């Protein structure tokens, strides 16, 4: 059995396999300022209550602070939902991106996580089954605590080799190129291999985050000592809690797993990767795009706005200035990340370099505010999507890369991984 088959089998209490349609009890449900109002409107038509307010998380992150009257009205309606049903796990604007908030506070191995956002797949990094749902489905989940799902097939991706120049973002872009934008439609992408086994949680979250860019239902990684260490140090779980999680740990026997496809990627000789307009699977080695002039750089998002990402970017910006023709926007993924970056002097480095620092949230990723692109402008971004018109004008251009490449390129004024 694959990892998702085992997780879902444990959830329902009997053995399931790819293709089975099952009803599942949800452990954690989340919507944000964009999807809570839609789910709330649908909920009103089916129920006067929610199944468990303590298992519902609402986070304002897409338009924070509200940048239009419509955005303000949406948040007003979402806040009505929060107050009406006594949702204690409410995170107002400025606390961070919903997925970073879930990672910092809520998700545990073996959970079934339902989110009103397509990048809910991020949380498979904890050894959970996490996936996105539409507003009507989220309304039903809020009302009943249940949903149905077809057990997805699984693509196994093993990352092997050694290469200190390659980041998790480079790896997941390479995987996107290999699988393609529709190659994993309604499938789970199960990551493994020595590189993943030694990767920290920030990197694993980046890998799983972009499963949806390949059409995936979720990305998933076995929980292990790195997972438990994160939960203990970053989340404050007790030794007793960790021991219980270890006892319930789910692992995969490769010889018994029935995968739709198995892929191995050796990063030993791999160049750093860049996705070029207008799809995340349109990926090229950086040598193919080096020298492309840019107007804007964005470092942030649920893909690469975590503390390790900001630390990496700061290494290349320290003592340097952003190119005169480039706007550099930096948005920490959460308040917690922001505060620690302040404490470490990282924000000081960014500000002195000439960066604009914005409220923790999604920022320009969705093209709503805080860095919208004009016609013909080119942005190098650490986000996950570079669709046509995604960040502004329909005739603007987005390249995707790692925080390292983003920082260096901001200094040079063109896409590069070289400072000298």
Curated annotation (Swiss-Prot):
Entry cofactors: [4Fe-4S] cluster
EC number of this enzyme: 4.2.1.114
Pathway assignment: Organic acid metabolism; 2-oxosuberate biosynthesis
Family: Belongs to the aconitase/IPM isomerase family. LeuC type 2 subfamily.
Name of protein: Methanogen homoaconitase large subunit
Coiled coil: none
Name of the gene: hacA
Binding site for [4Fe-4S] cluster: 302, 362, 365
Function: Component of a hydro-lyase with broad substrate specificity for cis-unsaturated tricarboxylic acids. Catalyzes both the reversible dehydration of (R)-homocitrate ((R)-2-hydroxybutane-1,2,4-tricarboxylate) to produce cis-homoaconitate ((Z)-but-1-ene-1,2,4-tricarboxylate), and its hydration to homoisocitrate ((1R,2S)-1-hydroxybutane-1,2,4-tricarboxylate). Is also able to hydrate the analogous longer chain substrates cis-homo(2)-aconitate, cis-homo(3)-aconitate, and even the non-physiological cis-homo(4)-aconitate with similar efficiency.
Broad enzyme group: lyase
Transmembrane segments: none
Keyword Iron-sulfur in annotation: yes
Catalytic activity: (2R)-homocitrate = (2R,3S)-homoisocitrate; (2R)-homocitrate = cis-homoaconitate + H2O; (2R,3S)-homoisocitrate = cis-homoaconitate + H2O; cis-(homo)2aconitate + H2O = (2R,3S)-iso(homo)2citrate
CDD domains for this protein: IPMI
Record-linked InterPro entries: Acnase/IPM_dHydase_lsu_aba_1/3 (IPR015931), Acoase/IPM_deHydtase_lsu_aba (IPR001030), Aconitase_4Fe-4S_BS (IPR018136), Aconitase_4Fe-4S_dom (IPR036008), HAcnase/IPMdehydase_lsu_prok (IPR011826), Homoacnase/IPMdehydase_lsu (IPR006251), IPM_dehydratase_rel_enz (IPR050067), IPMI_cat (IPR033941)
pH dependence: Optimum pH is 9. Active from pH 8 to 10.
Cofactor note: Binds 1 [4Fe-4S] cluster per subunit.
HAMAP family named in the record: LeuC_type2
One family name in Pfam for this protein: Aconitase
Organism of derivation: Methanocaldococcus jannaschii (strain ATCC 43067 / DSM 2661 / JAL-1 / JCM 10045 / NBRC 100440)
Record key words, sorted: 4Fe-4S, Iron, Iron-sulfur, Lyase, Metal-binding
Taxonomy, superkingdom: Archaea
GO molecular function terms noted in the UniProt entry: 3-isopropylmalate dehydratase activity; 4 iron, 4 sulfur cluster binding; homoaconitate hydratase activity; maleate hydratase activity; metal ion binding
